[in-house]
């Protein structure tokens, strides 16, 4: 939940940060890009380090670093210092996401792992719903710095909980030596696999279609829909409700229907929502609730697709699942950083172009899945 909190909580504070530090809106948005780029880069290392040193140790150290970075963000008096500490947050925030998936796969397999991953998605979906609403209240009642103080306190609670209750799922005899040549060899194997690109692309492009609206929220909600900082829940509650319901559906269906059929159901929601989003904004002006309703159904579809495809990706290299999880998360987050830093600023001034951008991401994801499915079926026939 740390990742969503560190992204979504401070979005309502963008105008306040801009006024406080006397910078442009683009410079404030680059704090999100800096975080995402650092997050993506470190994704490549969290899993590899956890494969060598154990899952629990990496999570505890990364939480401590994130807590320090949150204090730095709260104390930043220039945009440059805020960029630096957001980078430090990004370097540490992803450990729970990557290592957590590896822990699940260490202990469980098959439908049980798929169900647990869906359950984790449901629990984690609470954060993006609460975060922007909480951020809006905080920035209205106090100031934007209090948001980062909240993140510091929240992280302290996580450190205590993990230190006391989180077990080590990777015993020493199953760990791999942390060696640069070994890492290069492992990364080369993963990044030379066409199936990895196709399956990671499936998840990444689906996510990008939703994250486009997350990155554009300060403009989409305040300028196009006329909402205040306290109105961010109008977008994030439907999105997160969709993630929760989609993950619940995926959890219930895991093992009951073939994975490919579950993905097909997911794309029925994804494609339908994206098409309706484009059609509505071409014909009508943006308005609540119609402008955010497609995001609800889009999120349902995304959560139907992600668990099964993620497990397929992890099983491409069973002996180095930590590294595979890192590479997949890096791909997803790197695309998210491009969306936040390049695509969202270009498209966010027009609700129609935002909808078209989301539709384009769905088409890319469907193409990746189609090619991945063909490759998988071809492998099974040989």
Please describe what each predicted stretch is.
Residues 169-200:
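Juxtamembrane intracellular "pre-TM" segments in multi-pass secondary transporters
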Residues 85-126:
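Cytoplasmic helix-loop-helix junction between adjacent transmembrane helices
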Residues 41-79:
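Conserved MFS/SLC helix-loop-helix module at the cytosolic interface between two early adjacent transmembrane helices
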Residues 311-348, 357-358:
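A late C-terminal transmembrane helix in Major Facilitator Superfamily
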Residues 65, 69-72, 80-88, 289-295:
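Paired small-residue
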Residues 20-22, 54, 75-81, 92, ...:
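Helix-breaking motifs and short loop linkers at transmembrane-helix boundaries and internal kinks
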């Amino acid at each position: 939940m740390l990742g969503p909190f560190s992204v979504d909580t401070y979005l309502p504070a963008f105008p306040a940060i801009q006024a406080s530090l006397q910078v442009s809106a683009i410079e404030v948005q680059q704090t999100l890009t800096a975080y995402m780029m650092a997050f993506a880069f470190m994704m490549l290392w969290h899993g590899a380090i956890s494969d060598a040193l154990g899952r629990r140790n990496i999570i505890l150290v990364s939480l401590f670093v994130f807590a320090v970075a949150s204090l730095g963000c709260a104390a930043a008096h220039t945009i440059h210092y805020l960029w630096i500490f957001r980078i430090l947050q990004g370097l540490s925030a992803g450990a729970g996401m990557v290592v957590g998936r590896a822990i699940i796969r260490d202990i469980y397999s098959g439908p049980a792992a798929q169900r647990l991953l869906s359950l984790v998605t449901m629990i984690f979906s609470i954060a993006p719903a609460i975060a922007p609403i909480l951020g809006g209240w905080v920035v209205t009642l106090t100031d934007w710095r209090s948001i980062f103080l909240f993140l510091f306190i929240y992280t302290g609670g996580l450190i205590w909980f993990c230190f006391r209750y989180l077990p080590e799922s990777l015993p020493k005899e199953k760990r791999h030596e942390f060696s640069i040549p070994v890492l290069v060899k492992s990364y080369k194997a993963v990044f030379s696999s066409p199936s990895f690109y196709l399956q990671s692309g499936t998840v990444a492009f689906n996510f990008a279609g939703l994250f486009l609206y997350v990155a554009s929220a300060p403009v989409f909600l305040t300028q196009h829909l006329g909402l205040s900082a306290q109105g961010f829940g109008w977008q994030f509650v439907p999105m997160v409700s969709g993630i929760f319901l989609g993950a619940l559906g995926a959890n219930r269906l895991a093992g009951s229907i073939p994975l490919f059929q579950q993905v097909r159901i997911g794309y029925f929601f994804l494609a339908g929502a994206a098409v309706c989003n484009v059609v509505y904004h071409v014909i009508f002006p943006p308005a609540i609730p119609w402008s955010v309703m497609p995001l609800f159904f889009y999120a349902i579809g995304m959560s139907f697709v992600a668990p099964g495809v993620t497990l397929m990706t992890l099983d491409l290299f069973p002996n180095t699942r930590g590294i595979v999880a890192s590479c997949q998360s890096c791909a997803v987050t790197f695309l998210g950083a491009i969306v936040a830093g390049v695509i969202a600023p270009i498209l966010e001034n027009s609700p129609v172009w935002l909808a078209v951008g989301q539709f384009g991401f769905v088409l890319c994801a469907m193409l990746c899945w189609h090619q991945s499915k063909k490759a998988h079926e071809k492998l099974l026939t040989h």
